[in-house]
């Protein structure tokens, strides 16, 4: 807040532009193969299934492989059919985080012995609130402080298990000692289904709870 107590709007950059240099472009210069898997959401839709213009797609921004990267902030469905222009449907009922992990491991296998970088940006946690039935049952009676919607907990555990599969694959391939794994988030907790207290506010705000 400024001294007059009036909040000022933050500048909004609606999409990547040509002058923006991505880490994928820099890593390509260094000889790395790169893959983007999951939520792109930095360019407007220009076609069916969330498709974006090539120049502002993951491929246009330096990534060699794009799996599921579209204009979507949240997927039409976390279960196949996905209705995603950059992701072929899997078997009916396939869960999106599991599919993205399979694609990630396939990319790692395809680049064995080479330097590589994978950006695995799960759509989790986002609307629609969907998780595998066994996890929904597990969390069905676990409402309480910080968990206002039990589906939220189920989705987080599903993502946690998916990440564990990537780490296990790296260990099995003996790449776990020379691979840098960064786990981070793009925003705070989701208001309505979670509770960020004692931090103020939640996703969509510039207070601590939102970042």
What are these regions (language model features)?
Residues 1-211:
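Formylglycine-dependent sulfatase
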């Amino acid at each position: 807040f400024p001294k007059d107590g009036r909040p000022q709007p933050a500048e909004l950059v609606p999409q990547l532009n040509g002058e923006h240099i991505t880490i994928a472009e820099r890593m390509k210069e260094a000889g790395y193969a790169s893959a983007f898997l999951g939520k792109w959401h930095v360019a407007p839709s220009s076609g069916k299934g969330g498709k974006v213009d090539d120049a502002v797609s993951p491929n246009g921004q330096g990534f060699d492989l794009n799996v599921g990267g579209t204009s979507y902030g949240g997927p039409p469905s976390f279960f196949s059919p996905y209705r995603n222009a950059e992701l072929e449907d899997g078997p009916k009922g396939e869960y999106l985080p599991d599919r993205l992990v399979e694609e990630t491991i396939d990319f790692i296998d395809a680049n064995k012995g080479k330097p590589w970088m994978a950006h695995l940006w799960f759509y989790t946690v986002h609307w629609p609130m969907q998780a595998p039935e066994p996890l929904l049952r597990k969390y069905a009676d676990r409402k309480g402080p910080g968990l206002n919607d039990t589906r939220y907990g189920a989705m987080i555990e599903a993502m946690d298990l998916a990440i564990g599969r990537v780490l296990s694959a790296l260990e099995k391939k003996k790449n776990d000692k020379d691979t840098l794994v960064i786990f981070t988030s793009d925003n705070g907790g989701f208001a309505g289904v979670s509770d960020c207290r004692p931090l103020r506010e939640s996703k969509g705000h510039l207070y601590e709870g939102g970042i």
